[in-house]
Each structure stands twice: as structure tokens, then as C-alpha cells.
Regions:
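Hydrophobic hinge/microswitch elements
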Residues: 72-85, 91, 148-207
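Alpha-helical "hinge/linker" immediately C-terminal to small N-terminal DNA-binding modules
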Residues: 1-28
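Flexible hinge/capping segments at coil-to-helix
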Residues: 30-31, 102-143, 228
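Beta-alpha-beta core module
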Residues: 97-99, 103-111, 115-116, 177-226
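Central regulatory/effector-binding core of bacterial HTH transcription factors
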Residues: 34-97, 173
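Secondary-structure junction motif
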Residues: 91-94, 122, 128-135, 139-163, ...
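Hydrophobic residues within well-ordered alpha-helices
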Residues: 2-5, 39, 79-81, 138, ...
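A late-sequence structural motif
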Residues: 49, 130, 135, 196, ...
């Protein structure tokens, strides 16, 4: 395609989406209407939500298929803009902040599914497991970082830098399951959202400790493009994700029908 065609495609795609929405037959009937959706989320979030999603689909005999792919970056905007995925689920603070700044002109929408706090995770029997974790002890230890990009610098390192401290990242991995297995069999420390520890599959082998510094909480959001905002099938999908989070975690933050 020419550069001109590529430049026009987002506008054409948006117009087509509006046309589809205009002819949307109304309430989606999952038992009668085959549908496939692509979602992007980490393995930890998938472990939390997908068992509940599959249970919902199977229990009502829905002709619905889900395709889950890993996030390429910490900002899913490009995947959503290019219509590569229908929904992104994860902790995307920069994306959510930009949606707020854009206001009515925003092309993305979001809704919070659940909240969590970060904890320091180590193997059971680790020398630091039996006592309060100090900042000095934390910084002197060796660390594992879950990094989708492979960069050995994350939110914790930014926070430590503000305190004039650093840590050594011995290993970066891109899966929480892998992180749990490595930490359970080494003296490495890692920092995970508390809800994600279960996704490592090694909870019985791990110990959680409060962090020796302040770290903002994690907010797991689902984000979708405006083109799918009012399509009945996509609304049905998002409602199922909200229910899956409620069933898996026991609580969904109070909010309007689809937030902002």
C-alpha cells in the first residue's frame, strides 16, 4: 500500500466500525452467534481470569472462542489502534493516564478490574525470610525482574534511584510462572503483585515480605478501542471479563457500566 493509503486507513477503519455498530442487530446471543476475540494479557492475569472465562463460555454453550496473546510492551495502544487485539488487560498506568488527558477525544476506553499491592517474594528458607526486610538487606541481595521488554530497569529501580540506592538484577524473564520457579530454587528476590504469586504455581515454596520502601499499588484494567465500544458482542465480552475478575478475586471496584 502507498503511504497515502496507510495514512488514510485508520480513518477508514474507524468509519467501518461505526457502520458495523449502526447495523448491530442488538443483544448478542452467544449460543447462536459464533464469535472469536483476541485479548492480550500476561500469563499471571491469564491464569487468574481464563479459568473463569472458559467456565462461563462452557456453562452457557456459547459459540465463543478466545485467543490470548502476550503483551509486546507496557503500552497496548498500538495493538488496539491497529485492531490486532480486541481487549488489553493489565497494569497500564501510562495508557490510562493518556486516556484521561485526551478526554472526549480519546480513542480508547478503560475499566478497572481489580487492585493489588506489590510484595517482595523469596524462597521459603531464604536467609531473609525469617526477619523484617530492611532497605540495606534488600539492596544487597540479588534480584529477578519480570520484564516483557527484557530491560533490567523497572518501577522498583526508579523508586530506589530516588532514594539514592540501586540493586543488581541477575535475571530478567517475561513470565511470572518462570519467575516463581527460579525464585523458589535460588536466593534471588523478586517483586510481584500479591495476586500474581498464585500464578507462579509455587506459592507453597514461596514467602511474601512487605517491601522496605513505598511503592504505588497496581491497578489491573481492561482497555479497548472506541470502535468496539457499543458493539453488542464486544460489550458481552467485557461484561464476562468483569464477572471473571469478580469470581476469581472476590471483588470488583464500584464503577459505572463501562467507566471511561
Amino acid at each position: 500500500p502507498t503511504a497515502r493509503a496507510e495514512a488514510l486507513w485508520p480513518e477508514v477503519r474507524a468509519a467501518l466500525a461505526q457502520l458495523r455498530a449502526a447495523f448491530d442487530p442488538g443483544e448478542f446471543q452467544p449460543q447462536l452467534e459464533p464469535a472469536s476475540f483476541r485479548l492480550t494479557m500476561s500469563d499471571a492475569i491469564s491464569t487468574t481470569l481464563m479459568p473463569q472465562m472458559v467456565s462461563q463460555i462452557e456453562s452457557i454453550g456459547a459459540q465463543t472462542n478466545l485467543r490470548v496473546v502476550p503483551p509486546a510492551t507496557l503500552n497496548p495502544r498500538a495493538m488496539l489502534e491497529r485492531d490486532e487485539v480486541d481487549v488489553a488487560v493489565g497494569h497500564f498506568p501510562d495508557t490510562v493516564a493518556s486516556i484521561g488527558v485526551e478526554g472526549r477525544a480519546a480513542t480508547l476506553r478503560h475499566r478497572r478490574l481489580y487492585d493489588s499491592q506489590y510484595v517482595c517474594v523469596m524462597r521459603r528458607g531464604h536467609p531473609l525470610a525469617g526477619r523484617a526486610l530492611t532497605l540495606d538487606a534488600y539492596c544487597e541481595a540479588h534480584h529477578l525482574l519480570v520484564s516483557f521488554s527484557g530491560s533490567p530497569f523497572g518501577l522498583v529501580d526508579e523508586t530506589l534511584g530516588a532514594l539514592g540506592r540501586t540493586r543488581r538484577i541477575v535475571l530478567t524473564v517475561n513470565q511470572y510462572y518462570t519467575a516463581g520457579r527460579v525464585v523458589a530454587r535460588s536466593d534471588l528476590l523478586t517483586v510481584l503483585p500479591a495476586f500474581f504469586v498464585e500464578a507462579t504455581g509455587r506459592r507453597a515454596d514461596l514467602v511474601e515480605q512487605p517491601l522496605p520502601f513505598e511503592l504505588a499499588g497496581i491497578h489491573v484494567e481492561m482497555i479497548w478501542h472506541l470502535r468496539h465500544d457499543r458493539t453488542s458482542a464486544h460489550r458481552w465480552l467485557r461484561e464476562r471479563l468483569v464477572e471473571a475478575a469478580a469470581a476469581a478475586l472476590g471483588e470488583v471496584p464500584a464503577a459505572g457500566p463501562e467507566d471511561v
